[in-house]
């Protein structure tokens, strides 16, 4: 089993920035407050919360003046497959939830979870310990989450992660969301009929293809807006919007301000 690269992060971002994840994993908020957004919901985390997320792009903002401190635990497919196989008999005792897995799940950290996290952090500080100890601590953490009040939802998400058609769809959409195709063209290029494509998409993302594509383009445009000097009209075209006015309307609906206002806020914040 490959070693897992666990990272301790410190973020200071008072305005929403886009965070892209090519892997599924867990965030543990060690200090501060933070908000995560996907296309349909905002998730507010307080110190002591844990967040499970599926691969994808999200908008993130810190809610405190002090930097937020987080621990990122990636969960690659090979690790999860081994985990599910190893503890399959034990996990089969947990009620199955057949609902579409949520892209984000928030867990409140109980005393026993807190102790498990402390033990994991202690091992991470010891370079002389073998990596297998880290893996064992992560497995312990996953088991505790599986037997928590949201365990059925958590396991449902884990079981979907190793699904090859779903992984292929995620890769395909990340590579092609800027294409100006009709939905039937997306389905055809993926190698499916339109109805089957929509059904698979709903299973993976929990929203319609059009809503996901629109959200992904808005996040891409948001990155260009805050991290470059392109004009707003050029950003609109680059991100696949039919006009600047449509982009401005979509941006205001998503972030609560116009692109021009967001850029001015970024300049004022960074000096």
UniProtKB/Swiss-Prot annotation:
Instruction: Give the top-rank taxon of the lineage listed in the UniProt record for this protein.
Output: Bacteria
Where is the secretion signal located? none
Q: Give the transmembrane ranges.
A: none
Query: What outcome follows a substitution of residue 228 to C?
Result: In plasmid pYVa127/90
**InterPro entries this protein is in?**
AraC_XylS_family_regulators, ExsA-like_N, Homeodomain-like_sf, HTH-like, HTH_AraC, HTH_AraC-typ_CS, Tscrpt_reg_AraC-type_HTH
Question: Which keywords does this Swiss-Prot/TrEMBL entry list?
Answer: Activator, DNA-binding, Plasmid, Transcription, Transcription regulation, Virulence
One Pfam family, short name please?
ExsA_N
Quick one: effect of changing residue 99 to S?
In plasmid pYVa127/90
> Residue limits of the HTH araC/xylS-type domain?
167-265
Question: Under what conditions is it induced?
Answer: By increase in temperature.
* PROSITE patterns per UniProt: HTH_ARAC_FAMILY_1, HTH_ARAC_FAMILY_2
The record gives the effect of mutating residue 152 to T as:
In plasmid pYVa127/90
Q: Which SMART domains match?
A: HTH_ARAC (SM00342)
Which molecular function GO terms apply here? Answer: DNA-binding transcription factor activity; sequence-specific DNA binding
Q: Which residues bind DNA?
A: 184-205, 232-255
Task of the protein: Transcriptional activator of the Yersinia virulence regulon.
Q: What is this protein called?
A: Virulence regulon transcriptional activator VirF
Tell me the organism.
Yersinia enterocolitica
Gene symbol here is virF
């Amino acid at each position: 089993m490959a070693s897992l690269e666990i990272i301790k992060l410190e973020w200071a971002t008072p305005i929403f920035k886009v965070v892209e994840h090519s892997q599924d994993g867990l965030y543990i908020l060690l200090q501060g407050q933070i908000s995560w957004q996907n296309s349909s919901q905002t998730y507010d985390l307080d110190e002591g919360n844990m967040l499970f997320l599926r691969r994808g792009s999200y908008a993130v903002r810190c809610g405190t003046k002090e930097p937020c401190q987080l621990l990122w635990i990636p969960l690659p497919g090979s690790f999860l497959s081994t985990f599910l196989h190893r503890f399959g008999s034990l996990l089969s005792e947990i009620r199955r939830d057949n609902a579409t897995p949520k892209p984000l799940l928030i867990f409140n950290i109980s005393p026993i979870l807190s102790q498990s996290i402390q033990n994991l952090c202690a091992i991470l500080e010891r370079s002389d310990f073998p990596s297998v100890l880290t893996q064992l601590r992560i497995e312990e953490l996953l088991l505790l989450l599986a037997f928590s009040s949201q365990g059925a939802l958590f396991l449902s998400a884990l079981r979907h992660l190793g699904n090859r058609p779903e992984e292929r769809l995620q890769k395909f959409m990340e590579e092609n969301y800027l294409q100006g195709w009709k939905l039937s063209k997306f389905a055809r290029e993926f190698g499916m009929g339109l109805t089957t494509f929509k059904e698979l998409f709903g299973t993976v993302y929990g929203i319609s293809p059009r809503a996901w594509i629109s959200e992904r383009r808005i996040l891409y445009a948001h990155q260009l807006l805050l991290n470059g000097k392109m004009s707003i009209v050029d950003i609109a075209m680059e991100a696949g919007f039919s006009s600047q006015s449509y982009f401005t309307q979509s941006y205001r609906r998503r972030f609560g301000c116009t692109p021009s206002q967001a850029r001015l806020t970024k300049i004022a914040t960074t000096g």
